[in-house]
């Protein structure tokens, strides 16, 4: 998550990205966030009725826009300046601090801060030289892979699995 968020913030800082593209991306993210907060927008998203089982079916679009922003920033990584960390770090730390008070939040916050530190290290180490590029990419891919594994593990632990014996018989 933090690799995508950090790169998305870099996308907003990068001067090579047109203002129109930045405004459209931020506008979409804001619209999706408002749709999560206000049931009326959720009602319109679902064709004029409130869903019974799966509210916020459109929530994957938020992640998709964030990933598109991160990919666009990835393609412009040669433009990265260390001063962008003064924007990236507070934004990401603010997101981490939003988890205060949640169950098991300290462990999650520490792991998130560690992931953020590794992402920032990878961004600082990135240079057009081949060896530095490979090191930076390896660090970013390691963080992204670890975040994916943790998300999958937490999702499976939260929802749990159904055994074959629990299936209805015909």
Feature annotation, model-predicted:
Residues 1, 169-170:
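Secondary-structure junction/capping motif
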Residues 1-30, 119-127:
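Hydrophobic, aromatic-rich transmembrane alpha-helices
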Residues 26-40, 49-169:
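Contiguous transmembrane helix-bundle modules in multi-pass membrane proteins
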């Amino acid at each position: 998550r933090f690799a995508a968020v950090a790169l998305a913030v870099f996308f907003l800082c990068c001067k090579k990205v047109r203002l129109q593209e930045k405004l459209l991306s931020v506008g979409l993210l804001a619209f999706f966030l408002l749709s999560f907060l206000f049931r009326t927008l959720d009602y319109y998203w679902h064709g004029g009725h409130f869903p019974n089982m799966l509210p916020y079916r459109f929530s994957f679009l938020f992640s998709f826009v964030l990933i598109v922003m991160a990919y666009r920033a990835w393609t412009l990584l040669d433009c990265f300046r260390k001063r962008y960390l003064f924007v990236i770090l507070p934004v990401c730390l603010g997101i981490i601090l939003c988890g205060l008070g949640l169950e098991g939040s300290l462990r999650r916050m520490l792991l998130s801060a560690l992931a953020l530190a590794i992402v920032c290290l990878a961004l600082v180490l990135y240079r057009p030289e081949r060896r530095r590029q490979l090191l930076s990419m390896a660090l970013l891919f390691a963080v992204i892979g670890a975040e994916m594994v943790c998300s999958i593990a937490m999702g499976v632990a939260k929802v749990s699995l159904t055994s074959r014996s629990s299936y209805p018989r015909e």
